[in-house]
């Protein structure tokens, strides 16, 4: 027997509420697990850093640092490395992981995504893609940088953003791509945190969709086998989907984004430098 109209209405409203919750709120809760921004100052600015304010394509104001080579003029550096950091803190927290590069005659450009550090806005998948593309373009147009000698270096979620950029055709001047502790799929990581939530995320931003398009740009993937944040199998999968030239380094005792920390000394730093030099000067 059918329910009276006055009894069906609350039930229908409840069903609509549940549907709205699943469609609108759950995806936002899931994606928020990827972002842990703050504006805390983790250490002094690099002594030689130039503070750079720039605007994303959608008008969001962003903050970056340009740190020139410490061994000579910036326009004489081996290359300029554009660093896309992980999903927590801000660029001041990640500076120690790249602070060694200017001493090896590399310029470094770091930047904070929207909502991180002094950058305005709220993090989102589309927003971080916009921010990363905009940062690369800022570097391309600097008068003290060779725009044909750019290296993209992404750690954790930064690697996913870099793959998005490459996959959408932004390749001019990029001579090497380095991904450290990067995940292959947003959905897979989300499911680890909230089972089933991955189905509600936009997988069009996942790196596994674009990794094959990096070629013929040389690609280096590096991942610690003791990484409890992003399992190393993500890099293994990305490597399997990538085309040559490519290289995968797995660190037996490596933790999340610590390959270039002081814990490992110069072991992986030198391998990264050798990779970049090889990419810039390929053997025919």
From Swiss-Prot:
Q: What is its main location?
A: membrane
Task: Identify its membrane topology class.
Answer: Single-pass membrane protein
Spans traversing the lipid bilayer: 12-32
Annotated Gene Ontology cellular component terms: membrane
Its subcellular locations are: Membrane
Keywords, A to Z, come to: Membrane, Transmembrane, Transmembrane helix
| Family statement | Belongs to the serine esterase family.
Protein name stated in the entry = Uncharacterized protein YfhR
Q: Which organism is it from?
A: Escherichia coli (strain K12)
């Amino acid at each position: 027997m059918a329910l009276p109209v006055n009894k069906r209405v609350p039930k229908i409203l409840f069903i609509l509420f549940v549907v709205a919750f699943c469609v609108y709120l759950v995806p936002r809760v899931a994606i928020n697990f990827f972002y842990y921004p703050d504006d805390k100052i983790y250490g002094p600015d690099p002594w030689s850093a130039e503070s750079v304010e720039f605007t994303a394509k959608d008008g969001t104001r962003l903050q970056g640092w340009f740190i020139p080579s410490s061994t000579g003029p910036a326009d004489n550096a081996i290359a300029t490395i554009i660093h896309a950091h992980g999903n927590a803190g801000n660029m001041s927290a990640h500076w120690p992981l790249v602070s060694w590069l200017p001493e090896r005659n590399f310029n470094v450009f770091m930047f904070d995504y929207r909502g991180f550090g002094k950058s305005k806005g709220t993090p989102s998948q589309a927003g971080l893609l916009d921010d990363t593309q905009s940062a690369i373009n800022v570097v391309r147009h600097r008068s003290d940088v060779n725009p044909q000698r750019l290296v993209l270096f992404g750690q954790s979620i930064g690697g996913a953003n870099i793959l998005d950029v490459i996959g959408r055709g932004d390749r001019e001047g990029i001579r090497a791509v380095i991904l450290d502790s990067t995940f292959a799929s947003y959905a897979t990581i989300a499911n680890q945190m909230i089972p089933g939530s991955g189905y509600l995320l936009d997988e069009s931003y996942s790196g596994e969709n674009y990794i094959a398009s990096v070629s013929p740009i040389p690609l280096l993937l590096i991942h610690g086998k003791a990484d409890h944040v992003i399992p190393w199998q993500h890099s293994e999968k990305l490597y399997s989907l990538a085309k040559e030239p490519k290289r995968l380094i797995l660190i037996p005792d490596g933790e999340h984004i610590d390959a270039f920390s002081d814990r490992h000394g110069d072991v992986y730093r030198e391998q990264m430098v050798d990779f970049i030099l090889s990419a810039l000067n390929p053997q025919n």
